[in-house]
Regions:
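Radical SAM enzyme [4Fe-4S]-AdoMet core and its adjacent flexible, acidic
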Residues: 1-102, 106, 112, 123-128
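Flexible mid-to-C-terminal extensions adjoining Fe-S/redox cofactors in radical SAM and related proteins
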Residues: 120-214
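Generic structural signal for beta-strand residues in well-ordered domains
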Residues: 99-100, 108, 149, 158
């Protein structure tokens, strides 16, 4: 059975690089995400990104890039699932129709049968889209949480990272009182660009080491 570990990095975390290294050394597939505002408003400082915290992300990714360079040269496995999924997109020049399949072929179901488009929305009863015990509910309905990439606003359409971040997480936008078609706030968008550049650089290293026979 396939599985992965998921964890969230808060904006005040001074050990971003070390967090990635910890999960790589576990040698278990994992996904890390940067925290964003939610219904828990008591810790908003953990989801607010300053210029300093954004620069910390940039420096951590630069340091991690050197580690992955060594990993690839040695022919060792990378356990970062976000990276490996991006590799597939780059390798086959695939363009995602939307960033997330929530409400299309992915749903969250609670013990009482309540259905949500996304696990991030399950704290709000207003986001219940049906119940598995309701015979009238049809999964084939157009319930996608994420818009088609061509429906994103003009700022996203002109961005070089459009086909990598695909506009960003729609649940994150909803938590920020934005529409799914809108762009993320500047700080969050900046982090997405740092990560997109990082994915491209690691993929370039991956291709170079393969061509060298490693």
């Amino acid at each position: 059975m396939s599985f992965e570990i998921r964890a969230t990095i808060t904006s005040d975390n001074p050990y971003i690089y070390e967090t990635y290294r910890f999960f790589e050394e576990l040698k278990i597939p994992y996904t890390l995400a940067f925290a964003y505002p939610s219904d828990n408003t008591s810790n908003q400082t953990l989801t607010t990104y300053s210029n300093e915290s954004i620069e910390r992300v940039r420096c951590s990714m630069a340091k991690l890039l050197l580690d992955y360079k060594d990993t690839l040269k040695k022919g060792e496995k990378i356990y970062n699932n976000v990276l490996t999924s991006q590799f597939s997109l780059f390798e086959y020049r695939m363009i995602r129709e939307r960033i997330c399949s929530g409400g299309v072929n992915y749903y969250t179901v609670l013990a009482d049968g309540s259905i949500f488009k996304c696990a991030h929305l399950m704290n709000n009863k207003a986001d219940i889209i049906g119940n598995i015990y309701d015979d009238n509910f049809h999964f084939g309905a157009n319930l996608a949480i994420a818009p088609n990439i061509n429906e994103l606003e003009e700022k996203c359409q002109r961005c070089w990272a459009k086909h990598i971040c695909s506009g960003g997480c729609p649940a994150q936008k909803l938590s920020l009182s934005r529409k799914a078609e809108q762009s993320l706030p500047e700080a969050n968008c900046g982090i997405e660009k740092i990560l997109s550049e990082f994915y491209l650089k690691v993929y370039t290293l991956f291709k170079q080491t393969r061509q060298c026979g490693n």
